[in-house]
């Protein structure tokens, strides 16, 4: 379009205003004009003019397009400072191109306007403008300020027409964008305010634990949400969902929240065109998490409740009887179910389950322990019965062992232990002490069990402890130089020893000196203080005095004609010397000392004599070396075995000189030897016990054979008797089954 045509068209609005018309839509009625004949010259001139105008327009458009490209190049290549400096220096690219400079100023103005509006838009997004007026005032001031600042920054006159045209361009679109953004912000703020108000209102109600626990709390919440959606207090379904989620989250952290959530979960709400329950709206996983939090909060928000809960569980766990603990935990569980009625796992329920598992384990262990204790108790009673029977057999003369290792074992007793023997001994001694019989009878009964006991048995240990205590009482008196007023162990030992001194001496040979002391006080009437003083002198003897005593002792032995002294076993020499010295220093009488020593040796040894007419002594052997079992009197069986062995060896070796064998003890062995040393047979306690056991088995076998023979002798008589009885029984049965009238008499 040419400038002339543009000017003509642009003049019409002005013309309308001059005429006072309203302008309207610019409608004009169509006019027709008769064709005027035109000459070919005029037509040619017109076409020429039009062609020139079109050429000018095309050239101008090309110039403006090139100017647009050049202005873009300048903006791209140069910073604002460089452009300003280039303008001032006259070195700006394409500064001779007026179209390029015009386009540059227009674009600079447009960019400046967009920068200002971008700043305003950012402020809108940040929520700076709470009202429309605030936004408009700020934008107006920024536009005025920005137009000047940006123009000066690029070296352009702020009042430049092209710059102003670019700065003011697209104002409508920019306004729409800014006002729309601010309207959206205000709408969001209004919605947030509504949600905030609703949340504040709900919190005012739901923060009260008593309100949350009320049965109608769920109904209130349901109605509040429904009314809010209807009245617009809750602007949208999305915000309703947000409000509901937030309300449930808040309630779950408060006391009573678990009760509220339990009731409201199945209430219905319509959102986004669908009706669901609140549980379905939140989602099962999230709902369970809320319930766990709510039930945990019951305790976390109530310190006293939490403290009581912990103390109750600890109290239950610390009960000695797991049955009591289990009952307490069941009560705690019932209380917890009231506070946390749902099935979700909470820390409190975990504590309870853990406590229940511990108590169950304790219960299992306790049950097993009780069962074992009951079994042990029954077995203990059975053991005591078995032990008592063994002791009674032994006391009655049967050769049975009373060692716990040799007790008969069955499923009702289990394996025997030394503690079982101790329990039996304590029980039996207590029974004897509680009997209403004289003390002498009690001591006699105790000695029977003592004699029947095994070597290291409980009875011997108990009496041995008493003997040891008595020895310590005397030793303490020797050190102190005076016998105390009370000597309970010595008194008890004196009483029980007087009942059978030989048995006590045989069982505790290392206490021979103590037994001698008691005999000197009780039987010889020597003052205890005299004996104490003598013992103190004996302890304080010098080396020379000991040497003289040794010589005197050897002389006394050599002068004695007693076989027990002449053939004194080496194992008894030290004990014999103690007795000799004790009597000598206490009484000052060497003859009495020899007499007591001889008495001790006769009680502690057995003298073997030959088979000749003279009956010469062939050996002196300690009695305890000949014991075949734990019974002190079993040395007699060992003696008989040695006698049989001696006679058998002599009979099988007739060349032995004088048909005699010498017997002597050395260490733990007993030897039988002829005068030449060619025959030398060794025995010890183990071998004697073995021979005795074999002899017992042979005797038992003979007894069984004899009993069987007696039974076989009686068998025919017994069989005949049984046959007669069976025949008579058959006759009686037959008569019962047969009618009596067939025999000619009807009754």
UniProtKB/Swiss-Prot annotation:
Q: Where in the cell is it found?
A: Virion; Host periplasm
The protein's name is: Internal virion protein gp15
The UniProt entry, under InterPro entries, shows:
Gp15
Single biological process term from Gene Ontology: symbiont genome ejection through host cell envelope, short tail mechanism
Give the primary localization class. virion
Q: So what family is this one in? A: Belongs to the T7virus internal virion protein gp15 family.
**Keyword Nucleotide-binding tagged:** no
Q: Any idea what job this protein has?
A: Component of the cylindrical core that assembles on the inner surface of the capsid during capsid formation and plays a role in viral DNA ejection into the host cell. The inner core is composed of stacked rings of gp14, gp15 and gp16 proteins. Following binding to the host cell surface, the internal core is disassembled and gp15 is ejected along with gp14 and gp16 into the infected cell. Gp15 probably remains associated with gp16.
**Keywords for this entry?**
Host periplasm, Viral genome ejection through host cell envelope, Viral penetration into host cytoplasm, Viral short tail ejection system, Virion, Virus entry into host cell
Q: Name one GO cellular component term.
A: virion component
User: What's the subunit arrangement here?
Assistant: Homooctamer. Interacts with gp16; after ejection the gp15-gp16 complex composed of a gp15 octamer and a gp16 tetramer probably binds both the viral DNA and the host inner membrane. Interacts with gp14.
Give yes or no: UniProt keyword Transmembrane helix. no
**From which domain of life does this come?**
Viruses
